[in-house]
Amino acid sequence: MHSIFLFIFIIINLVVVTSVRAETWVLPPHGIDIFGQIRTTQASRTETLLDIARQYDIGQIEILLANPTVDRWLPEDGAKVILPSRYIIPHAERKGLLLNLPEMRIYYFPETKQGEKPMITTYPVGIGRMDWVTPLGVSKIVEKKKDPTWIPPKSLQMDRIANGEQPYPSIVPPGPTNPLGRHAMRLSIGGGSYLIHGTIKPFGVGMRVSAGCVRMYPEDIEALFDKIPVGTQVQIVNQPIKLGWLLDSLFIELHPPLEEEEAIYADYWQMAVNAIND
């Protein structure tokens, strides 16, 4: 008999932990799609929920959805905080980097040498806003830069002016005011105009805040940067509904669809049921 389980970040086996950054897990074999473990921690009066999210390598929207009764800015001292750190691998080739836009999370499949077990690591990311959508498709890393210089695109400058904001300087040198942070990796998609990069605004990780690029916590892209060679495949997919098997149990993981596709997902629950039946 098969069992079906639904989780929207929150599923079984809550484990209390004290500190975790991005963990590397053994990649489950094909036919098993789930890895990681749901955990809990306790808030202290000196930190916000977003501080906790960064400490445990979770995005802002992820931790808010997992903890709807915990105040974002002033969590009660000792409040239990659920850390949504169990994942269904998106349905795509398990190779290189795999970004699922609705999930705002990227998966990394390191190349495996003979005799080594295949591994998987995952990181939260920020993605493009509704009017600056991060493009879907199969791409690759074509360039890597440490301490990059940033030339703001004309479209972004015009947007800032239209919103009554000061435009950026025409050239932003490396340093603490550079929005790209200290690391940038250029994608082939979109004529090379999209980057995976760090940020000087880490609270935007796990949100739709960019002009189409992919933002990572500074410490995450620093850890990833030297592991990713030029030529690494990057898949960008749109899967708000994910299905995954663990032994004889089918799990379904739901994420809010991208705002521009809300009409398509108007009957979200029925689509989830249809996905199971298919």
Feature annotation, model-predicted:
Residues 24-57:
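Primarily a LysM-type cell-wall glycan-binding module
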Residues 157-278:
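Exported/periplasmic cell-wall-interacting domains
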Residues 5-16:
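Bacterial N-terminal signal peptides
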Residues 56, 60, 67-71, 85, ...:
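Sec/Tat-exported extracytoplasmic proteins
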Residues 23-35, 60-97, 240:
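Extracellular LysM carbohydrate-binding repeats and other cell-envelope/extracellular binding modules
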Residues 46, 76-81, 231-234:
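Loop/turn positions that initiate beta-strands
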Residues 68, 77, 83-142, 146-149, ...:
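Intrinsically disordered, low-complexity
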Residues 44-74, 118-119:
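LysM (lysin motif) carbohydrate-binding repeats in extracellular/periplasmic proteins that recognize
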